[in-house]
Amino acid sequence: MKPTLLPCSLLRAAGLGAVAVGLFATSPSAGAAASAKRPNVLLIFADDLRTELGCYGVAGIKTPSIDALARRSVRFDRAYVQFPLCNPSRASLLTGRYPTATGVLGNTEFLGSRHPDWDTLPMYFRKHGYATLRTGKIFHGGYDDTDAWVEGGEPRPLGNADRKGSSQDPKRSDSIVVLEGDGESHADYKSATRAIEYLRKYGRSEQPFLVACGFSKPHSPPTAPRKMFDLYDVEKIPLPADFAPHPTVPKGFPERSVPARNGDLFIGREASIREAREMKRAYWAAVSFVDAQVGRVMAALGELGLRDNTIVVFWGDHGYHLGEKGKWSKHGSLWQVGLAVPYMISAPGVSADGQACPRVVECMSMYPTLVDLCGLPAISGHQTPSITPLLRQPAAPWDRPAISVSYSQRTLGRSVRTERWHYADWDEGRAGAMLIDTEKDPAELRNLAADPNLAAVVSEMRRHLRLLPAVGSRP
């Protein structure tokens, strides 16, 4: 049924052979064949998903399948993407490099044309004997690493070139899409179905697989079956304490900290409290729809007897404002809600399942961590270490900061987080800076950057930013 629209080259894949199993250990009950091969990998990505999940402590939202996955994973409670936008974030994740090194600072740049010699995560696994299989959104739409996949690769992107930017139509930005039935007609349902087909086809093989399943929701317009909307009473949908009808810079913060125009929802107009609740309800429904698809894929993984030899990673590609500071998008946000994402890793025999890791981590750690877990040769060029030690001991000491950037109006924004502090600046501080004590001010409402008593903290945070390569530099 139609949805209801409501306003409101293989050459590069050749080469390196198989290697021995590394850190990963299968369960004693696993068969001889499963024990002999390297672990499988299942990647599950969601678009525009912030830590709006039951397992992350959000009361009222219904995410039973992802919550169940969390109970068999290490959940990273302070995981930060390296850019608050789809293309740059995914390019960073899939190369293990900062956005300033990839040169992808927006949704119109193609990673492949900038660094054709780099092995992305799926390409590296393919070169090392994995059947790499894609369904849904893994790289940014239209910018796939075509040759990295045995199956599922998109046609080579746009003649290997960048493309012109596009702007969202303000008249359609507030649309909410209601699906009938279970949403079988939607691309995300179909992506889950194809992932299940991959598991059935490749799960019996001696060749290990890497299945990458990417969901397009809850990206705008929020879309879900009617029954998902029915899970939530709009009158009980909570709004943030710093809600405002339009993007609003908090007192004492730089103007650039909150872009004046929303990029996804309520573009060019104010949001009433009622409209805000309706939109957040739709976002929650879309998250529940994604959760149902995760449940389908995980059920198949278990039914096929693959769970004990498969590393599962769940990740959201960046955060999202749902009214915080009057903002309804991710664009340009260096705030907690713009950069913090769900990040879970289940590695049977390695991960301390069911535990939460309180350490600050960078999401681009995924690539070196999977290489580590699967016993593949370490790859040069990665700009963050494997977080395997935190899978074994989630509370172990970890002093690596998390660095993120944004880029707008030819100005680079930089953010760095440590256990206690969050510092951000624009144009290296010439366009403003902010310092937040995240222990005392988790909502990020007070800017301490100008406090003379904290000058040493500011200096220390700026020293951390030296880890960030200059724009266009090569590792």
Residue ranges and their predicted role:
Residues 2-17:
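Bacterial N-terminal signal peptides that target proteins for export
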